[in-house]
Amino acid sequence: MSHVVDTPECSCAALPDLGEMPLGELARSHPQALGLLRSLRLDYCCGGARSLREAAAERGLDLQQLQRDIAALQPQASELPQQPAQLVDHILQRFHATHRAELPELVRLAHKVERVHAGHAQVPRGLEELLQRCLDELSQHMDKEEQILFPMMQRVAPGTNLQPPVARMRAEHNDHAQLLVELRRATDDFRPPAEACNSWRALYAGVAKFCDDLVQHIHLENNLLFPAFEPARGA
């Protein structure tokens, strides 16, 4: 008697090839993957023009495994406004107002931690100055958006070419991304020493939140809002 061994069929659908997709486009089309991309430090904001393949190679990541991980994530319905004018309002309320409220407190807290723990080997020396730079540069940047660029975007139709002022904002976003790198380095990846006091822990938690917020802020502008006013960029 012959025995036939049934081989189970593979239930895995063919993975979409995301390797050549720019990170910014990936973040836009797969919002459920934003947390994964952030955890792997794949820059989909200012580095959004690089392909997933290039970014994975730079980080020493297995592209096929990365694509499987992305495919396994459940799609999420976007809760973001679809029209640029409404997206501007969302950015103003969710990010501009938040940065203005939180950054001065982080500067104050950094001053306290650096002063009280000046003799500690792991004190984040220079963090107050770095956060003050963030506050100063980001305040000037947001003022320009609020006084010049955003009113223009709310007056004209999507597809209108506003590439020159948008390009200036993109360039400033690149500067902000470098500040994020410096903040991560200054706080040892937001990890306080084991014996850190509550103020020190609160400082690092606040800096981590600010960095995460700024990444999302830049993503919304670079990958969702700005392209609506850069027709030549996609040509």
Predicted features along the sequence, with ranges:
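Small-residue-biased structural context
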Residues: M1-A235
